[in-house]
UniProtKB/Swiss-Prot annotation:
Pfam families with a match to the protein in the record: AnmK
Gene: anmK
Organism for this UniProt entry: Shewanella oneidensis (strain ATCC 700550 / JCM 31522 / CIP 106686 / LMG 19005 / NCIMB 14063 / MR-1)
Functional summary from the UniProt entry: Catalyzes the specific phosphorylation of 1,6-anhydro-N-acetylmuramic acid (anhMurNAc) with the simultaneous cleavage of the 1,6-anhydro ring, generating MurNAc-6-P. Is required for the utilization of anhMurNAc either imported from the medium or derived from its own cell wall murein, and thus plays a role in cell wall recycling.
Protein name: Anhydro-N-acetylmuramic acid kinase
EC code(s) of this entry: 2.7.1.170
UniProt KW keywords: ATP-binding, Carbohydrate metabolism, Kinase, Nucleotide-binding, Transferase
Domain of life: Bacteria
Entry keyword annotation includes Nucleotide-binding: yes
Involved pathway(s): Amino-sugar metabolism; 1,6-anhydro-N-acetylmuramate degradation; Cell wall biogenesis; peptidoglycan recycling
GO MF annotations in UniProt: ATP binding; kinase activity; phosphotransferase activity, alcohol group as acceptor
């Protein structure tokens, strides 16, 4: 059978590494051929975190990081190919998400900015790169996010089955697949892992709360939870999208200023509940019952999954592996899929999801030649 090899590159708001996946799209379902995660070096991570907040000398820092992130993404590709022993000329294209450093779609002139120079990736891998997927949607009046619902629709939708696909990265987003002729919907619910990771990093110097064990040892403070949930984002109507611009360490410190008496683990438990409650509220607005399939890093947090299940008694909950897609690599696969859509000249946004005025072919090609 012919092969249709694409590589997907993803680094999300969690900034916990660059995921590189090699996918074959020749069959009906995407087939995952190989995976690799490239760790983001500490100096680069600190530079990126700093760039996500307004500061001085931004353009110089942006320019340097754009190239450095491009080199890191290229390294991820080259290591993936070495691992899978597949030659670069067998790859049709790389789909690169880049690293988001600003996402401001709701300004009078909205914009989004991802860095990781695709020219650098193309020249250092010898493979054409499809990148800059979000800005066409914004040019058409959309949010530029989330982009994965179109992939979810094609891969996970089934007639007669009401399904919600929940991706929990730094930010959490949901795709509602009604299983009938109703529109597919999708939007960011709010924080996923970003605040629980930030707090465990600040207090315990650990990169994440494994299995939610630290949160499980604490007790949620109802007053703090109510205050966090009063953030205006949670009551916005969709289409909506968010990022570190709204939910970051500075915002968290501001929220915690009146709660100095709380134990650190109680704060962690409350932050985990913020993620779970904001997700559950949005899911219940769409449908009281159905099937929920989780992907992204949050799928591996046992305490999070347990709390979600308690808030959504009408849902059968599993990870996307039950549908044949490894939850760790689902987003990387989605960006390989977006590259394929560009290659085939097919649209990849869902206007009902992003708010764009029409469907569009997303991205641009950066040739290796």
């Amino acid at each position: 059978m012919n092969k249709a090899y694409y590589i997907g590159l993803m680094s999300g708001t969690s900034m916990d590494g660059v995921d590189a996946v090699l996918v074959d799209f020749a069959g009906e379902q995407p087939q995952l051929i190989g995976t690799h995660t490239e760790t983001i070096p500490t100096h680069l991570l600190k530079g990126l975190q700093r760039l996500c907040l307004p500061g001085t000398d931004e353009i110089n820092r942006l320019g340097r990081l754009d190239r450095s992130v491009g080199k890191l993404f290229a390294l991820a590709v080259n290591n993936l190919l070495a691992k899978t022993k597949i030659a670069k000329d067998e790859i049709i294209a790389i789909g690169s998400h880049g690293q988001t450093v600003r996402h401001m779609p709701n300004l009078e002139v909205g914009f989004t900015l991802q860095i990781g120079d695709p020219n650098t990736i193309a020249t250092e891998t010898g493979i054409d790169v499809i990148a800059d997927f979000r800005r066409k949607d914004i040019a058409l009046g959309g949010q530029g996010a989330p982009l994965v619902p179109a992939f979810h629709q094609q891969t996970f939708a089934q007639v007669g089955k009401k399904r919600v696909i929940l991706n929990i990265g730094g930010i959490a987003n949901i795709t509602y697949l009604p299983g009938n002729s109703e529109e597919v919907l999708g939007f960011d619910t709010g924080p996923g892992n970003t605040l629980i990771d930030a707090w465990v990093q600040q207090v315990k110097n650990e990169s994440y709360d494994k299995n939610g064990a630290w949160a499980a040892s604490g007790k949620t403070d109802p007053q703090l939870l109510a205050q966090l949930l009063s953030h205006p984002y949670f009551s916005l109507a969709y289409p909506k999208s968010t990022g570190r611009e709204l939910f970051n360490q500075a915002w968290l410190e501001q929220q915690l200023s009146a709660f100095n008496q709380l134990n650190e683990e109680d704060i962690q438990s409350t932050l985990l509940d913020l993620t779970c409650h904001s997700i559950a509220q949005d899911i219940l607005k769409l449908a009281q019952e159905g099937e929920l399939f989780v992907c992204g890093g949050g799928a591996f947090n046992a305490e999070l999954m347990q709390r979600l299940a308690a808030l959504l008694p009408g849902y059968r909950i599993d990870t996307t592996s039950a549908l044949g897609v490894d939850p760790k690599w689902a987003e990387g696969i989605a960006f390989a899929w977006l590259a394929m859509r560009y290659q085939l000249g097919l649209p990849a946004n869902l206007p009902a999801v992003t708010g764009a005025s029409r469907e569009a072919i997303l991205g641009g090609r950066f040739s290796a030649k």
